[in-house]
A protein has these predicted regions:
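Long, low-complexity serine/threonine/glycine- and acidic-rich segments characteristic of extracellular
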Residues: 159-215
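Catalytic-core segments of enzymes that bind and process phosphorylated/nucleotide-bearing substrates
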Residues: 1-156, 166
Length: 215
């Protein structure tokens, strides 16, 4: 973690499951969770899962007592310390913003959360409906801020100028551009491949993928 920024970007994937860390960080940010290492940089309320061999370490959410305590219009990057250094690596910023939008579009919105808040309120005899206002305001704010920080672009394939082509090779590498909501390619109805994200401080949105042409 003490490596210079350029070296950290090249080495961090060897020890951290960065994608999992960015998704957990997005959840903490959206939910306005206080008293936690993830948002406030406090030195507690973090657990680590270290797989055998020590690669792919995952940070686990822990002791989330103070939910919805952050401002609904607070920063969309609330991590500090070394996590913020990892998050600010261009590729990881792109991944993090993608997770924020994915959660806002799927689960962190009042339409999805209303029945769950009602359900768990009934289970413990409490009224959680007031939380919907925070969720609505926070999700709208985060969606707006992401679009402001990184304006949307259209998906495109830039290999061969985006034109059709033919090859006798057993695989081909395609390159292109895509916004933060582009992470994988559907090769068949049952097969997805993650794109290799190519991001720099000047341009976040490059991608490439090696596609097998012979089964």
């Amino acid at each position: 973690m003490d490596l210079p920024n350029d070296q950290l970007g090249r080495k961090i994937d060897e020890v951290m499951d960065v994608d999992a860390w960015m998704r957990a960080a997005a959840m903490h940010n959206l939910s306005g969770i206080g008293d936690t290492w993830w948002n406030a940089g406090l030195q507690h309320n973090l657990r680590l899962y270290v797989p055998q061999g020590g690669r792919g370490v995952v940070g686990l959410p822990w002791d989330l007592d103070f939910v919805f305590t952050g401002s609904a219009t607070g920063p969309i990057k609330s991590a500090g310390g070394n996590l913020r250094r990892v998050m600010d690596i261009p590729t990881n910023t792109r991944i993090y913003y993608g997770h924020l939008l994915d959660m806002v579009d799927t689960v962190f919105n009042p339409e999805y959360m209303e029945p769950w808040l009602a359900h768990y309120g009934n289970v413990i005899d409490q009224n959680f409906s007031g939380r919907l206002s925070y969720i609505r305001s926070r999700s709208n704010f985060v969606r707006s801020r992401v679009r402001s920080e990184v304006p949307p672009i259209s998906f495109s394939i830039t290999t061969n100028g985006g034109e059709s082509m033919s090859t006798e090779a057993r695989s081909i590498t395609l390159e292109g551009e895509g916004w933060v909501n582009v992470r994988s390619a559907l090769l068949t109805r049952k097969s997805h491949m993650l794109l290799r994200l190519v991001s720099t401080e000047q341009f976040l949105f490059g991608w490439s993928i090696s596609v097998p042409l012979v089964v």
